[in-house]
């Protein structure tokens, strides 16, 4: 019996296991599976390259986004500083406006007092000039009642 033949049913073989065909030639295995493995490797490498390209694209986008976030943070800091400066300037303006308002109120009050005093002085002058003086009425040259005796 040759190695390629199946065992006889009578069991003339020393063991009860069937005889297996010889393993394929190593060169035959490479030719059958090598081309398939190379194709699989090429496909895997292509997928890997595509994935790497996508990762590189995402990394680039993320870098741009991080730069934008940093720029935004810097602009917000500058805006906050400007807001603080404007608030301080507004506070100073409010204080100065209050002082100026009080100063103008006092100036207006002084002017009203001066005008009031001038008006009182003018009124006194007018009253004195129109009212006869007390010295004129006591000299006898004033209004005397004329009495005449009846003619006889």
UniProtKB/Swiss-Prot annotation:
Membrane-topology descriptor: Single-pass type IV membrane protein
One Gene Ontology CC term in the entry: synaptic vesicle membrane
InterPro entries the UniProt entry points to: Synaptobrevin-like, Synaptobrevin/VAMP, V_SNARE_CC
One MF annotation (Gene Ontology) recorded for this entry: SNAP receptor activity
Disordered: annotated span: 1-30, 133-152
Tissue: Not nervous system-specific; abundant in cells of the gut and Malpighian tubules.
Knockout mutant characteristics: Cell lethality.
Cellular compartment(s): Cytoplasmic vesicle, Secretory vesicle, Synaptic vesicle membrane; Cell membrane
Residue stretches of biased makeup (Polar residues): 1-16
Reported function: Involved in the targeting and/or fusion of transport vesicles to their target membrane.
Family according to the record: Belongs to the synaptobrevin family.
Name assigned to this protein: Synaptobrevin
Species of the source: Drosophila melanogaster (Fruit fly)
Gene behind this protein: Syb
């Amino acid at each position: 019996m040759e190695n390629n033949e199946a065992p006889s049913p009578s069991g003339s073989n020393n063991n009860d296991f069937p005889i297996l065909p010889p393993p394929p030639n190593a060169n035959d295995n490479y030719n059958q599976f090598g081309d398939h493995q190379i194709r699989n490797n090429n496909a895997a490498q292509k997928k890997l390259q595509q994935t790497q390209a996508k990762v590189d694209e995402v990394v680039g986008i993320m870098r741009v986004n991080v730069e934008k976030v940093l720029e935004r943070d810097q602009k917000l800091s500058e805006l906050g500083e400007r807001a603080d400066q404007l608030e301080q300037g507004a506070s100073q303006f409010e204080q100065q406006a209050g002082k100026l308002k009080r100063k103008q109120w006092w100036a207006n009050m002084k002017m009203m007092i001066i005008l009031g005093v001038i008006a009182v002085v003018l009124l006194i002058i007018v009253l004195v000039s129109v009212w006869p003086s007390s010295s004129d009425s006591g000299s006898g040259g004033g209004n005397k009642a004329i009495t005449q005796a009846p003619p006889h």
